[in-house]
Each structure stands twice: as C-alpha cells, then as structure tokens.
C-alpha cells in the first residue's frame, strides 16, 4: 500500500464555537464565553475531538478546534513500524508544528489537549540511527521525554494550559481492508503504555502550565 495515504485524513479547518446567548432580562448577566479547546494528536485525538465537537454544540460550554492528523505521533523524525508497517515520518507530520502555530494564533486556545500515543510506543528508528528502539530503552526514553517537553512549551507559548492524557493500552485488530501490516504489533506489547505514561509524568514535573489526565 501507499504508506503516505495513512495520513491522508485530518480534521476540518473549522472550529466549533457555540454562540453566546444574550441575557433575556435586565437582571440576568451575560454567561461566560465558551472555553476554547484545541485538540492535538493522531487518529485517536481526531476521534476525541469529534466527540468534543458534539458536546460543544449540545452544551455551549466549550469551543473546539480539532487538529488531529491520522498517523502523526508526538515524537518527530526517524522511522516507525506502527501497525507493522515500516515508514518514514510522513510529510504531513513534518508540517504539523507550522500548521499548529498558525492555528493557535487564530484560535487563541485556553486549553490545548494532547491525546494518543500509539505511534510513540511502537518501535522506532531515531534520526541518524539504524537500530530499532522503543520505550523502556534509555536512549528512546530520553528522546520521548524531550519531545514531551518541547510540545508542552511550544503549545503553551500563547498562554494556554497544556493538558495531556495518559496513553491507553493499544491492541490493534488486523483488518485487510485498511492500511495495516499483519500482527503481531509492537505497540501492543505489555508495559509499553505504562512506560510512556511514566515518562510523560516525569517530563511535565517542571511545567506548571501543564496537566496529566488519566484515561
């Protein structure tokens, strides 16, 4: 299959921002504006963002900008073999930070929500190396911790609170109709999500503008 098609799907450019209803009487106060939430991550984040968009429309309490991109992990560069397909870091992912900076400038989020992790717990070749590595190995752990800190600082640069969710346990099911290699899948190996979550919490210890929410 054309591996570039794995990242062909991304979120809409349109934010879901409920309108504020004016007070109906002289004694009523104007309700606070919706909290602006920008969702960042891969297909997992894309799905979470779609759910938040529905809730935004129903509740009027939040505005949502869904920037999830299928196939884009949080860590930059190198190669990975998620869903058992070896591939370079996709072109769409290489443009991610530039796109996010532009979207932050327009949307002005109060909260940036990052969720996902599958592409970061699978096996990876880091830039400039020829060896597969993964969470639990010191070199990769140091790389991932630095990437968490980088994204937290970058996405919090406009004053937003940066909220990360922990990674769930991933157990991909093979579907020959989709762009997947056959199992077994490296990201499904025991302990990987748990190690990811340990690194995430450690990375954010000195970042007062950040939070970790357990899924």
Predicted regions and their residues:
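Extracellular mucin-like PTS domains
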Residues: 13-29
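Conserved SGNH/GDSL esterase-like catalytic core that processes O-acyl groups on lipids
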Residues: 31-40, 44-138
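Stable alpha-helical elements in mature extracytoplasmic
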Residues: 44, 48, 52, 96, ...
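Anion (oxyanion) recognition and catalysis
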Residues: 57, 156, 205
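Short, well-ordered beta-to-alpha junction loops that form the rim of enzyme active sites
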Residues: 116-118, 166-169, 215
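The substrate-binding groove and active-site-proximal loops of carbohydrate-active enzymes
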Residues: 133-142, 184-188
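A short helix->loop->beta-strand "cap" motif at the edges of active sites that frequently abuts
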Residues: 157-161
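Substrate-gating cap/lid alpha-helix
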Residues: 172-215
């Amino acid at each position: 299959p054309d591996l570039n098609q794995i990242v062909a799907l991304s979120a809409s450019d349109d934010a879901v921002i409920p309108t504020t209803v004016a007070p109906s009487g002289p004694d009523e106060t104007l309700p606070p504006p919706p909290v602006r939430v920008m969702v960042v991550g891969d297909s997992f984040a894309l799905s979470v963002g779609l759910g938040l968009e529905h809730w935004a429309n129903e509740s009027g309490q939040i505005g949502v900008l869904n920037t999830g991109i299928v196939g884009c992990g949080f860590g930059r560069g190198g190669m990975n073999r998620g869903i058992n397909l070896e591939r370079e870091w996709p072109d769409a992912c290489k443009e991610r930070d530039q796109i996010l900076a532009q979207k932050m400038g327009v949307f002005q989020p109060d909260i940036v929500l990052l969720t996902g992790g599958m592409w970061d717990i699978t096996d990876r070749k880091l830039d400039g190396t020829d060896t597969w590595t993964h969470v639990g190995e010191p070199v990769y752990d140091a790389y991932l911790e630095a990437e968490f800190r980088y994204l937290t600082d970058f996405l919090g640069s406009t004053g937003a609170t940066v909220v990360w969710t922990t990674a769930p346990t991933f157990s991909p099911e093979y579907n020959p109709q989709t762009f997947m290699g056959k199992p077994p899948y490296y990201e499904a190996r025991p302990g990987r999500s748990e190690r990811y979550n340990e690194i995430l919490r450690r990375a954010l210890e000195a970042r007062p503008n950040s939070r970790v929410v357990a899924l």
